[in-house]
């Protein structure tokens, strides 16, 4: 059932991300080293950890579907923490909104006639879906709406599968690079440290792009590797993709730390659980929580160091 026939969109989410991405000054950022190939990134030592790429593939299998003449929703794998949707109309400006049980609304641009993957980041519960076509300016009309109530049994699914913002496949150069970087790792923390070190020393901040990027921008992780530069969203997408391909559940989060816009990555580590803000971008620099501390501290001490979450106010999770 349609909730509203006409809505007005503002680019609040992208403004939050892009405001963050355009912060900082060139003199605060060291020059990046030249990107290495995945083969060059490999070390002689072979670690104890299995570094075989683990790339989950979302499926629009057609078991459970909904739709109309312009929109198709595949809800066959809600239990895995994602849904798939495609727009088959002729309008060139189409928005998709997904509101979860926490009442946070995610707004996406629909960019393809193929099925695209969207994570159910708010967990199990009622989700409202709505697709809107542009009428004029910022005015959009509802062309499809639907309520779904997924029971997500694979709670790591939303943070292991690719999606619009974190897009990778087994053939991605970034996935091959992650496997090479992880070859010498003994545990997940070694992989996190290796990925962080590589990306922050081989990718430089693109100030020109930060000033000109438009609403609807989606990262291209292999493009970031090839160019050796990107904005904070490119950094985050690249690192999350690499870690997920190594079977490390990782969240890309955007929100506030205190009064400041921040982007941070949180990863799930055995014995410690979710480590919030293991990598963080403050508008100028990326920083990494000391992995030695995380590895050697008790769960209680680690949680005390990280805090109870009150310092972080997450707005969106991808």
Summary of predicted features, one role per range:
Residues 71-75, 208-213, 232-233:
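Short N-terminal helix-initiation segments at or just after the protein's N-terminus
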Residues 162-227, 275, 283-295, 302-318:
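Secondary-structure boundary elements
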Residues 234-318:
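Hydrophobic/aromatic-rich core segments of domains that either
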Residues 2-187, 274-275, 311-318:
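N-terminal accessory/pre-domain segments preceding catalytic cores
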Residues 191-195, 228-243:
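Active-site nucleophilic cysteine motif
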